[in-house]
Amino acid sequence: MTLNSSTEDGIKRIQDDCPKAGRHNYIFVMIPTLYSIIFVVGIFGNSLVVIVIYFYMKLKTVASVFLLNLALADLCFLLTLPLWAVYTAMEYRWPFGNHLCKIASASVSFNLYASVFLLTCLSIDRYLAIVHPMKSRLRRTMLVAKVTCIIIWLMAGLASLPAVIYRNVYFIENTNITVCAFHYESQNSTLPIGLGLTKNILGFVFPFLIILTSYTLIWKALKKAYKIQKNTPRNDDIFRIIMAIVLFFFFSWVPHQIFTFLDVLIQLGIIRDCEIADIVDTAMPITICIAYFNNCLNPLFYGFLGKKFKKYFLQLLKYIPPTAKSHAGLSTKMSTLSYRPSDNMSSSAKKSASFFEVE
């Protein structure tokens, strides 16, 4: 694309060097359909997660705080998804004005950072709870968890500011359509490269390394605990869960991160081949569907690793309201934290039985 100086009606006019890139009839049908499915499943699932954690489980643990915020971040994003579905169904014609363009774009960016940061904190919390249960008890408090979530929301908001500032409505003169897009002037290459690298590094590389390290250390601690506790049967499900969590995160986000960076190179004119631009523009919405569908399933995925979460979730589906009896098991909850200081490795093996309990 080449920026033009014309700004009639307050909308900048640009030329699209590859006007047919990513414009395929199957994309205009398939992607809105997938967005609609993600919207329905995500709103339903994440709303139930919020109700279960807040009203049934009463938000009593660190893990539940992170999961609640994860579900809320997903709901904020999902509310803007119908706009993107309409936008794609209308063959990338944006009818909602510049303000909604910025808000919807910021919501997508915010969800990316908030979800990734929360999953990273959740992995650190699991590491501390399982590997260092005694040492971390004073640090793993509800106050610390809530303050951490506030910081995460602020950081995600700051990381989303470029979408508010630089995402705008543009009129493409050679195709006569109005789009909601990032557009960079070719002479200013520092900004888009900086934003692209920030998204790649801050939104994926660093979090993935922390998540990988946390669960690897958990894996090693549990293996060591099982060797010491020879009479304790090894729970292979825990190791499968760890592997699934790491791979789930990696393969959900890698495609989107790769094509995001390629898109920056196209915007800068470093990649000028329209065939490559077509591949990138066609694949981009598909990678978005993969990343954000998995993102919206995360609260359910992590929640269902806890037995009591599944119990309350099924109660909710059966329209059984939360009662005082639902929270009578406080001694059971506290027992998972009552370890003898001299029995740290033994407690790791015991703790693996409730690897992701959020109650």
UniProtKB/Swiss-Prot annotation:
Q: Topologically, how does it sit relative to the membrane?
A: Multi-pass membrane protein
Q: Which residues bind angiotensin II?
A: 15, 17, 167, 182-184, 199
GO terms for MF: angiotensin type I receptor activity; angiotensin type II receptor activity
For this protein, the record's PROSITE patterns field holds: G_PROTEIN_RECEP_F1_1, G_PROTEIN_RECEP_F1_2
GO cellular component terms, A-Z: plasma membrane
Q: Where is this region: Disordered?
A: 339-359
GO BP term (any one): response to xenobiotic stimulus
SUPFAM superfamilies (UniProt xref): Family A G protein-coupled receptor-like
Enumerate the transmembrane spans: 26-55, 62-89, 99-125, 142-165, 191-216, 240-268, 279-304
Record's compositionally biased regions (Low complexity): 346-359
Q: Does the keyword Glycoprotein apply?
A: yes
Q: Which domain of life is it from?
A: Eukaryota
The subcellular localization recorded is: Cell membrane
Glycosylation (residues) = 4, 176, 188
Cytoplasmic side of the membrane: what ranges?
56-61, 126-141, 217-239, 305-359
Sorted keywords for this record are: Cell membrane, Disulfide bond, G-protein coupled receptor, Glycoprotein, Membrane, Phosphoprotein, Receptor, Transducer, Transmembrane, Transmembrane helix
Disulfide bonds, which pairs? 18-274, 101-180
Q: Which family does it belong to?
A: Belongs to the G-protein coupled receptor 1 family.
PANTHER family linked to this entry: CELL ADHESION MOLECULE (PTHR10489), TYPE-1 ANGIOTENSIN II RECEPTOR A (PTHR10489:SF956)
Described purpose of this protein according to its UniProt entry: Receptor for angiotensin II, a vasoconstricting peptide, which acts as a key regulator of blood pressure and sodium retention by the kidney. The activated receptor in turn couples to G-alpha proteins G(q) (GNAQ, GNA11, GNA14 or GNA15) and thus activates phospholipase C and increases the cytosolic Ca(2+) concentrations, which in turn triggers cellular responses such as stimulation of protein kinase C.
| The protein's name | Type-1 angiotensin II receptor B
User: To which species is this protein native?
Assistant: Rattus norvegicus
Which lineage?
A: Eukaryota, Metazoa, Chordata, Craniata, Vertebrata
